[in-house]
Amino acid sequence: MNMVVIGVTGMPGAGKGVVSRIAESMGFRVIRMGDVIRDEARKRGEDPGVTAVRLREEYGKYVVAEKCVERIQESESEMFLIEGIRSPHEVEIFRKRFPGFRVISVFSTRKTRFRRLRKRQREDDSQRYAEFVERDERELGFGIGDVIATSDYMIVNEGPIWKIKKQAKQILRKLAEKGEESSRGGQEDG
């Protein structure tokens, strides 16, 4: 089997984590770009949003993607899902390093995402709407809108959770099968 590397993108609270959990259940190794940021933020004693900006200022726009590439290359797995792609530069790195790299975007309205984040209560989740909007603006500043707009697959996540799970399984299964076909010399259909 050829290595299968898939990226998932979406604004905070859109449902990337649901797609990642489905991927894990299917045997994918999930690499979370946000974990790279959160780990570094803890070391620095900073807010993860501040760290995300500073890392890119200090080490360049490819820094988080390069750290993910290292994790992939160190692993023995053959199927990977990279959660949390934020910029076209990151997509560029993954496409250069991994032929056949595809991006799945998950979309939810701002209202839906804010409601989910308030329930989730992760350390970097905003409980105030103004902070939530500020985080959205920061994400958009990284170029996430362009990544979403140019993704290979899109899942609209406004309904019950079973719908996103079903769509994610279908897309991931299709991409995993293409990886198997590539290793056997099969043709890709798109």
Curated annotation (Swiss-Prot):
Entry keywords, A to Z: ATP-binding, Nucleotide-binding
A single Pfam family, by name? Answer: AAA_17
Record keywords: ATP-binding included? yes
User: What superkingdom heads the lineage?
Assistant: Archaea
Q: Which GO molecular function terms does the record list? A: ATP binding
Q: Which InterPro entries match?
A: NTP_hydrolase-rel, P-loop_NTPase
List positions binding ATP. Answer: G10, M11, P12, G13, A14, G15, K16, G17
Which family, according to the similarity comment? Belongs to the UPF0200 family.
Query: What HAMAP family has UniProt attached to this entry?
Result: UPF0200
UniProt protein name? UPF0200 protein MTH_434
Q: Which organism is it from?
A: Methanothermobacter thermautotrophicus (strain ATCC 29096 / DSM 1053 / JCM 10044 / NBRC 100330 / Delta H) (Methanobacterium thermoautotrophicum)
